[in-house]
Amino acid sequence: MISSDIISSGGIDNILKDLYIDESQLEYQRKRYINALNRFTQLYGEGDVFIFSAPGRSEIGGNHTDHQNGKVLAASVNLDIIAVVRPVNSKESVSEEGSLSGHSGVNAGIIRIVSDDYPMIQVSLSDTDINKEEYSTTKALVKGVTAGFKKKGFKTGAFDAFITSDVPMGAGLSSSAAFETLIGTIQSHIYNAGKVSAEDIAVIGQMAENEYFGKPCGLMDQMACSVGNMVYIDFNNKENPVVNKLDVDIKKFGYSLCITDTKGSHKDLTDDYADIRQEMNAVAGYFRQEVLRGITLKDILDNFKELQEKFGDRCILRAVHFIEENERVENEVNALTSGNIDEFLRLVSKSGDSSYKYLQNIYSTKDTANQGVSLGLMMSEIFLGDNSVYSNGVCRVHGGGFAGTILAIVKDNAVDEYRRNMDKICLLYTSDAADEARSV
């Protein structure tokens, strides 16, 4: 049984090092885990527990390509969500893994979750229907993941959980995808002997977000959180995407991933995200395709006038972004795996430039007074230097965009100064590619 004494004495330090990479994080993480255990006990009483972790993600390349069956280069990051969990036995929930027998009682068949200081949510295993009044709520995600497990023929079960997160909400590190992955990982390990694949958990999470949470999204966020590390994903077959973990470490080249929160939030940007997908799909529809994958730049240029008249300028810009970005991902992977860090950085910078000019997901046209991402990129470029020189690194928007976080790949010896510069307007997290969602 994991206890506060075991954690404080260093009994899980090796696991924590695997999860968080940076040994300077050990003391903080020990305290964090102990606090989570104590909070769980306050809520649900003494007893044996599981602990689970699911990381946030950073998109390295492939901005808004996943929903068009494109390619993505992404990494899970060492900012995560952890859950202290105890299974609750009922007729529907029979554990196949571990020494925990769970407990029966009035809450059998009910998932109970407290997240940090938020009120408890409760989800019945027998009530997993979509409810539009629950859109954009945590309860909707839990219901969606539970329903997804049932639809795929996996077992589901009730549990009590206390969850605490270091993944900033609404900041672009995919807190919702990390949460979906966490719930899926709990159901997999407690009720399916840990045999539900990371890919299945990701697909279930995407379904939960699209159908139950009411937010259109591709599969990149969930796949990166669930599979972990640095990963190349090709969504050409969205039912069975190609997923390759890359044996690459940016740190070996003397660079760090830096995630900067520009303080804006993704919470009110659903329409902006939906517009990108709808406009890309409109251009694809012109060619009698559902998505842009397979459509070439020549196709766009040969039909430029009619596309412009039918759909307007921005649709063309966004379609061209997808076509070029999709090719760029493949080139980024090749540059990384061959050790050509200069070419990789050039491509990352080019990706950010395309997102700014063509994809146009740096700020919302509904709120032009607030442009935190634009300011973050400006400050980064001033410090990092001319993008053609890469004096200290490169930067780009990542993820959904419009608000939240930016990504910078910064020389290790420049990270502290970059932090000091960015902390004037933002909050910077130094990160590394982390492990997949797992039981601790």
Show which residues each predicted segment covers:
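Phosphate-handling active-site elements
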Residues: K152-F159, Q187-I201, D412-I425
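Glycine- and acidic-rich phosphate- and metal-coordinating loops
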Residues: T146-M169
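Alpha/beta catalytic cores of group-transfer enzymes, especially the acyltransferase/condensing modules
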Residues: A193-V242, S351, L377-F383, N387, ...
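Structural signature of FAD isoalloxazine-binding scaffolds in flavoprotein oxidoreductases
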Residues: K71-N89, V227
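C-terminal nucleotide
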Residues: M1-R57, I82, R86, S90, ...
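DPxDG-like acidic metal-binding loop motif
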Residues: S76-L79, L173-A193, L407-V410
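Glycine/serine-rich anion-binding loops at beta->alpha junctions
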Residues: A54-S58, G62-N69, D166-T181, S391-I409
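Single conserved hydrophobic/aromatic residue that forms the stacking wall/gate
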Residues: Y429-V440
